[in-house]
Structure formats: C-alpha cells, structure tokens
C-alpha cells in the first residue's frame, strides 16, 4: 500500500455512557501528541477530541489518513467512524487501549492497528505507507 499522505485527522470519539474518564478530569493526550509530532513533520493535521469539540465529518471524509483512538466505552463509535472513513477512501489507523488489547477486533475496521504507546510506531507506519514498504 503506497499512498501519498498529506492530510491526517486524529479522532477520539465521545462515549455515550459513563466511563473511566467521566468523573475524573484526566486528559487523553495520545491524539494531541501524535498530531503535534506529525504537524512538526509538515503534515496538515486536525485533531478532534469529541468531549471538547464536535467532529467535523467533512474533515474526516477528506483526509488521506484517519487515526481513531478507542477505549472500551468508545469502541462502537470508534469502529463506526473508522468504517465511514475507510469507505471514503482514507487509510485508517486505530490505536488506544481497547485496540491495543483487542487488535484483531480493531483490524476488522482499520487498515492498521498501533498497539501500546504510538509515538514512534505511528511515525514509522506513516513513513512506510508513503514509501510502500512492507505491505505486500
């Protein structure tokens, strides 16, 4: 899979019910950190944390790559979003604690799953996609 990637959109969907972050203000910084890293490398980046800002689906549907973070309480929404982005032609990467522990489930909705902390793996994955390396 060799693709020219310019526009990257990172999304953390909002849960429809209570979860670990509902009662305690603990920010999930993975998407913000990855977005900042990729912006510093010259990519056009958007980051949507739905608890803070509504997701602009026009941005998602026009992205070259959509990275979706999933915790267990947001997995259904995350998978629906991943399916929509994939149907629109984006490369879809899933990460977060849920897909780290359930990668086979994540791969049913994404092109790639990044497990664990993704600061280095995500950059390497994007570089490999651009070069078309190692993906058969």
Map each language-model feature to its residues.
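Glycine- and acidic-residue-enriched helix-capping/strand-helix junction motifs
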Residues: 17-31
């Amino acid at each position: 899979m060799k693709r020219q990637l310019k526009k990257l959109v990172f999304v953390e969907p909002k849960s429809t019910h209570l979860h670990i972050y509902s009662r305690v203000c603990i920010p999930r910084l993975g998407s913000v950190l990855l977005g900042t890293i990729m912006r510093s490398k010259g990519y056009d980046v958007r980051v949507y944390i739905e608890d803070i800002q509504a997701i602009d689906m026009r941005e998602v549907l026009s992205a070259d790559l959509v990275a979706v973070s999933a915790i267990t309480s947001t997995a259904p929404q995350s998978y629906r979003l991943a399916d929509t982005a994939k149907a629109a032609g984006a490369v879809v990467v899933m990460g977060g604690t849920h897909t780290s522990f359930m990668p086979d489930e994540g791969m049913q909705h994404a092109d790639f799953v990044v497990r664990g902390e993704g600061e280095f793996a995500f950059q390497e994955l994007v570089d490999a996609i651009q070069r078309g390396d190692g993906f058969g």
